[in-house]
């Protein structure tokens, strides 16, 4: 459906085990989700530590040491791939409204370390080379051919 709509890629897969999202057994790097489709799936970057995949974007980036994401980006770059990083725009707004009656787990996930996020992002951007996703898709698609 995405390819039919003109999309060249998706980055919807997180190769991790998680209670709300994730596909534990997904490939860590680009793949074609449908055999005869031109669509390329670019899984978000995870750190591989002791045989496990650890998420490094979004709330995990916010709450875990930045060194983990740095490690993951260096790891995927060393294996010849680009880091695929994501965050949610609301994660750089420490003054966002709070949902008073939200469960504690949701509060921890959504509000922890919001004030640190912008600085962590600036540091991540400065420490690594980043590029345009169209170039990444073209390179990864060529590797899949």
Predicted features, each with a name:
Residues 1-86:
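Active-site-adjacent pocket scaffolds in enzyme catalytic domains
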Residues 63-145:
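C-terminal domain-boundary segment and adjacent tail
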